[in-house]
Regions:
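N-terminal pre-transmembrane cytosolic regions of membrane proteins
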Residues: 1-129, 134
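Structural beta-strand/beta-sheet cores of well-ordered domains, especially the beta-sheet scaffolds
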Residues: 33-35, 88-90, 178-180, 313, ...
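Extended alpha-helical interaction modules
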Residues: 95-253, 259
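Cytosol-facing regions at membranes
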Residues: 129, 189, 234, 281, ...
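Short, positively charged
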Residues: 174-190, 220-225, 229, 264-289, ...
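Signal for well-folded cores of large energy- and translation-related assemblies
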Residues: 233-236, 240, 283, 373, ...
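Membrane-associated alpha-helical segments
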Residues: 257-382
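Alpha-helical transmembrane anchor segments
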Residues: 360-431
Length: 431
């Protein structure tokens, strides 16, 4: 047996490898009654849902999920459970065998009837979607039998699915029990194909509702954006006619408006991005079920395209308005800030020019003072020389004191001036 080389493994290798197998569809056999509930949940509620499913498994003496479990499938005897933990929501799917003989003749029995009521009422989060799906092992089932007790006639939709191997009926209405309803005629589909089709139908309803979460946010954002756009238009007009004294106040208003726009953007951007992703998933799942028109009925794809287009466009338009407004506010802020900075630079240059003029005046005054200083110092030194000449006269100094003073004046003046200039240069070199 050859030696196995085991290089260092990436810490996420197994997790990434198994992601392709995450949440696989399970093989199913008709007839089935399926109840699908989607609970919108924050991080704490998603964690609580793991504890909630663990409590149910504990009551049935089954193995509990570990802290990293994000989905599980379990047969609990009275019903089969499928639990999935998503980024924003938790899905609970309950399955039981369905009675086919009298289906359509009276109110159908939901799989939810087999689930413990108290445990069901305590599901963490808020219910976003609840759907009853009945899977029947027949090829055809008259729509007249469905509209009497199962679906609403005025909103009935139907199509063939799985390339003609099955039929699906729904009305996209919330009935008295709080659930929407769907009927799937499985015909002779294999168990795995049926499992894939059921999962896609459930995901269409789940992602449709998740995508529409962006619609209330878009409507609320539209009112805020309309106010911000009016405010920006007023600011643009005010900036155009503003003088220098008005600009700081305008810049403050513009800065506060930018903060408001960015706050709104931060609050809704992730919601709009998520809605866009969910809308794409709805499109993909509708394509996956491979439906075609049935007896002139409107298909699920046609209904979704007609009814969701407006909501989708509203969310996309709100996101584009936010981006455009943010860019406009940023551009106007930069322009006004540049204008203020240019005027500040001009003011600084004027101030520097004034300072230069003052410095020139100070230099002139300093030169005048230096001249007076030379005269004063020369006067005192010549006075001393005169006294010395008078004393020297008695000792034989040949010149009179007046002549000595006259000769000393230019010499003393030049010496004093040179000394002051030398001191002046020495001080300026130090600074």
């Amino acid at each position: 047996m050859s030696a196995t080389i085991s290089p260092t493994q990436h810490p996420h290798r197994v997790l990434l490898h198994n992601e392709i197998h995450a949440r696989p569809p399970e093989a199913m056999s008709a007839p089935l009654a399926i109840a699908h509930i989607v609970m919108l949940a924050d991080a704490a509620e998603r964690e609580a849902s793991r504890a909630h499913v663990a409590a149910l498994l504990r009551d049935h003496h089954l193995a509990l999920p570990d802290a990293g479990t994000t989905h599980l499938r379990m047969d609990l005897g009275a019903f089969r459970l499928r639990w999935e933990l998503h980024t924003e929501f938790v899905s609970w799917t309950f399955m039981v065998p369905a009675a086919v003989e009298s289906f359509g003749e009276r109110e159908p029995v939901s799989a939810i009837a087999s689930v413990p009521r108290e445990w069901l009422a305590a599901l963490p989060g808020q219910c976003l979607c609840s759907l009853n799906l009945w899977v029947l092992p027949t090829h055809t089932f008259g729509s007249g039998s469905l509209i009497k007790h199962v679906l609403h006639e005025d909103t009935l939709l139907a199509s063939t699915v799985a390339d003609g191997h099955g039929e699906v009926y729904t009305d996209f209405a919330i009935h008295a029990d709080g659930f929407s309803r769907m009927v799937l005629l499985a015909g002779g589909m294999t168990q795995r194909r049926l499992g894939r089709l059921v999962q896609r139908l459930l995901e269409i309803e789940t992602y449709r509702m998740a995508a529409l979460l962006g619609l209330p946010a878009a409507r609320e954002a539209s009112a805020v954006l309309a106010f911000a756009e009016r405010e920006l238009a007023e600011l643009a007009n005010a900036i155009r006619t503003a003088n220098r004294d008005d600009e700081p106040a305008l810049l403050d208003r513009l800065t506060r408006l930018a903060g408001q726009v960015e706050s709104q953007y931060a609050a809704t951007h992730s919601r709009f991005s998520a809605s866009s992703a969910y809308f794409e998933l709805v499109d993909r799942r509708i394509k996956d079920i491979a439906e075609s028109r049935l007896a002139g009925m409107q298909t699920i794809g046609e209904f979704m395209d007609r009814r969701l287009t407006l909501a989708r466009s509203t969310c996309e338009w709100a996101a584009r308005r936010q981006d455009a407004l943010s860019q406009r506010v940023s551009r106007m802020s930069n322009l006004l800030r540049t204008r203020v900075e240019i005027e500040q630079q001009q003011s600084s240059q004027a101030l520097l020019a004034t300072m230069n003029q003052r410095q020139d005046l100070q230099l002139k005054l300093q030169s005048t003072v230096e001249g007076l200083s030379v005269a004063a110092i020369t006067y005192y030194i010549v006075g001393l020389v005169t006294y010395l000449a008078k004393g020297g006269k008695a000792l034989g100094w040949p010149l009179s004191p007046e002549s000595t003073a006259a000769i000393a004046i230019p010499l003393v003046a030049v010496s004093v001036w040179l000394s002051l200039r030398r001191l002046h240069h020495r001080l300026f070199r130090k600074h």
